[in-house]
């Protein structure tokens, strides 16, 4: 949805984006933090999807270098045939990326492998293979897209829910009824076209348009756990090419932590806060433990989170296997003229948006205008950033945050002794990033909830007080915000 807003507004179209909760509240903030082509899909022979994703990976790296970086991934080899097998396959992966590649895949000796990833299991290790993919911060990218859309004239509003669609006498959608979910106001807007890009909720909007609409999405739950970066021991990521359920498993350095995941559990229900299953958590700990010298335990988990992939439903709706559910995106157009886009992944968001805007513009008769996002610098663009401090995620906006602290030294105070989040980051989130709640700040503006849920709970009262002063809220609001966030954060902590 944010990608569509950026694409359409940068072409000069008038755009309104409404989000029922906060930007990236659900799936978009709960990824494996990768911008990648998908090695697993290459193994499955889905070459066209891999090529598209690799090219989009390169474009995203070029358009937002402050948020996307080259990450070295290590595959440890424990059998004689694995090093030549994976080296050949990953060299093909590199070739498919063409000029948008990030680096060459190479075989490694045992010594080189352990230098890259000291935490890798030493016993029976023969060597390894290194390949390159992208790593990013998902919700910070979402906020960057919101700001980029705004820079091009789009109106983006969070906590604004579509409650019904308005149609003209011909049955075509010409407007929508909206509800402010924080303040309770209701509104109506007139529109020429509607793009339904609501992730796992696309079916709800389609049924709002046409109650008998067949479901287009099959949710699949992916769980991740976050542990200390010492489990990996280096700056490179771990890739386990085949777990017992046939997936790959990643261990990715991220903001001084390590993200381990993911799972692939088909579900029939949607939730803004899906709950990780015990068996999913145990699966990740077990599989990671088979490849790491230090075996992660439940007591080592700093945060656990689950997200729902909006996979395009298979032709046979009774299929239970997520392997049969397409990772490609699909576009549907209803009789009323609403365009729905579903499937896909973070890496290909820009391509999905380009296709959606091309189609909706033709559908409603807008003047054809070329897409400009393939080589468009996103908000905050900065080529060189210091990734040792939190401020790098803001790109060029970090200078303005530094100016706040220069004008008032108290804004440089840390929110928590163990992290570099500062009072100024909360002020900035409220003034410039549309943060409305403590959760918005601690989950998606700074990533404390996903990095260390207990520490985030300790930050909540301070954040609530800062926001209350900035937003003119009373003590009751502060108390309610801390209570709500504490109840939420408990779901990110293992008992």
Regions found by a protein language model. Give the residues of each.
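Glycine-rich FAD pyrophosphate-binding loop
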Residues: 9-30
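Residues forming the Rossmann-fold NAD(P)(H) cofactor-binding site
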Residues: 2, 143
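Gly/Ala-rich phosphate-binding loop of Rossmann-like dinucleotide-binding domains
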Residues: 5, 9-10, 148
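C-terminal accessory subdomains/tails of enzymes that are appended
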Residues: 21, 67, 78-89, 102-123, ...
């Amino acid at each position: 949805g944010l990608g569509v807003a950026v694409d359409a507004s940068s072409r000069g179209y008038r755009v309104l984006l409404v989000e029922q909760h906060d930007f990236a509240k659900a799936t978009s903030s709960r990824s494996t933090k990768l911008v990648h082509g998908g090695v697993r899909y290459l193994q499955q022979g889905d070459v066209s999807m891999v090529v598209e994703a690799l090219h989009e990976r390169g474009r995203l790296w070029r358009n937002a270098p402050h948020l996307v970086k080259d990450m070295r991934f290590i595959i440890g080899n424990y059998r004689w045939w694995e090093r030549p097998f994976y080296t050949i396959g990953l060299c093909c992966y590199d070739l498919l990326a063409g000029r948008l590649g990030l680096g060459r895949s190479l075989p490694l000796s045992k010594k080189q492998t352990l230098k890259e990833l000291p935490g890798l299991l030493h016993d029976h290790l023969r060597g390894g293979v290194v390949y390159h993919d992208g790593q990013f911060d998902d919700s910070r990218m979402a906020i960057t897209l919101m700001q980029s859309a705004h820079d091009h004239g789009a109106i983006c509003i969070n906590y604004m829910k579509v409650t019904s669609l308005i149609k003209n006498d011909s049955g075509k959608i010409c407007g929508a009824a909206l509800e402010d979910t924080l303040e309770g106001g209701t509104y109506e807007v007139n529109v020429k076209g509607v793009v339904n890009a609501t992730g796992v909720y696309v079916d709800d909007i389609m049924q709002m348009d046409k109650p008998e609409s067949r479901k287009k999405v099959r949710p699949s739950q992916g769980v991740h756990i976050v542990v200390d970066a010492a489990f990996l021991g280096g700056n490179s990521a771990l890739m386990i090419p085949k777990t017992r359920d046939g997936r790959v498993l990643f261990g990715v350095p991220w903001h001084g932590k390590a993200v381990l995941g993911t799972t692939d559990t088909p579900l029939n229900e949607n939730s803004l806060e899906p709950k990780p299953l015990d068996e999913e958590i145990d699966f990740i700990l077990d599989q990671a433990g088979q490849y790491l010298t230090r075996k992660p335990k439940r007591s080592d988990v700093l945060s656990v989170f689950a997200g729902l992939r909006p996979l395009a439903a298979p032709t046979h709706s009774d299929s239970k296997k997520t392997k049969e559910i397409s990772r490609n995106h699909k576009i549907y157009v209803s009789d009323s003229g609403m365009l729905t886009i579903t499937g896909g992944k973070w890496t290909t968001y820009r391509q999905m948006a380009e296709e959606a805007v091309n189609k909706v513009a033709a559908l409603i008769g807008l003047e054809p205008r070329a897409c400009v996002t393939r080589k468009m610098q996103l908000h905050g663009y900065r080529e060189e950033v210091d990734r040792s401090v939190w401020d790098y995620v803001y790109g060029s906006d970090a200078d303005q945050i530094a100016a706040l602290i220069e004008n008032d030294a108290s804004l440089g105070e840390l929110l928590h002794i163990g992290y570099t989040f500062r009072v100024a980051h909360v002020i900035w989130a409220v003034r410039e990033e549309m943060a409305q709640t403590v959760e918005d700040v601690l989950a998606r503006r700074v990533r404390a909830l996903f990095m260390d849920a207990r520490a985030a709970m300790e930050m909540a009262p301070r954040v609530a007080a800062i926001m209350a002063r900035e937003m003119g809220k009373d003590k009751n609001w502060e108390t309610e915000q801390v209570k709500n966030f504490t109840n939420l954060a408990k779901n990110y902590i293992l008992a």
